[in-house]
Amino acid sequence: MSRIGRLPIKIPDTVKIDVKGNLVIVEGTRGKLVQDIKDSINVKVENGSVIVNRAFNDKKTKAYHGLYRSLIFNMVKGVTEGFSKSLTINGIGYRVEQQGNSLFLNLGYSTQFEYVVPDGVSVKLDGNTKISVEGIDKFKVGQVAAEIRSLKKPEPYKGKGIKYDNEVIRRKVGKSGVKK
């Protein structure tokens, strides 16, 4: 058995889970998420917990077993607590502005970037150098944060760019000139 897959998922009182064929529907106070499940994986709701089992013991099915258990766990956590990622913009003249559903980023280039935030994810700004990405779908939150970070990744000499709050940038020593 998969070490992750065999663990049951406790369902909080505020969450409702339905299994209809190959679809798992999770509804909570923050919203609703739907996940399609492979035929080789069985999902049951029993005694206030979700149990994920597999039909076969081949290598691929074993991998899917742990994957779908983690996906369902993240869905339950998302509709109760939600997920968030924080980004920091570092550099002289680097800043971000929000207008409606779009972010406008000045990142040292001659033009500013416009990033349209997709549905299901909200973005909050703290000043003009901090970005907080929030939502109920862990994948979407991580994807949006990664797309914003990819606009200007932090460089190792001065640390200019967009980085996650918990990310540590390995700094390099610059060239030292020849002294006579």
UniProtKB/Swiss-Prot annotation:
Q: Which GO terms describe its molecular function?
A: rRNA binding; structural constituent of ribosome
**Top-level taxon:** Bacteria
Q: Does the keyword Transcription regulation apply?
A: no
**What's any one GO cellular component for it?**
cytosolic large ribosomal subunit
Q: Which InterPro entries match?
A: Ribosomal_uL6-like, Ribosomal_uL6-like_a/b-dom_sf, Ribosomal_uL6_a/b-dom, Ribosomal_uL6_bac-type, Ribosomal_uL6_CS
Answer whether the UniProt record assigns the keyword Glycosyltransferase to this protein: no
List the NCBIfam families hit by this protein, alphabetically.
L6_bact
Which family does the record assign? Belongs to the universal ribosomal protein uL6 family.
**Subunit annotation:** Part of the 50S ribosomal subunit.
Q: What is this protein called?
A: Large ribosomal subunit protein uL6
Organism in which the protein naturally occurs: Borrelia garinii subsp. bavariensis (strain ATCC BAA-2496 / DSM 23469 / PBi) (Borreliella bavariensis)
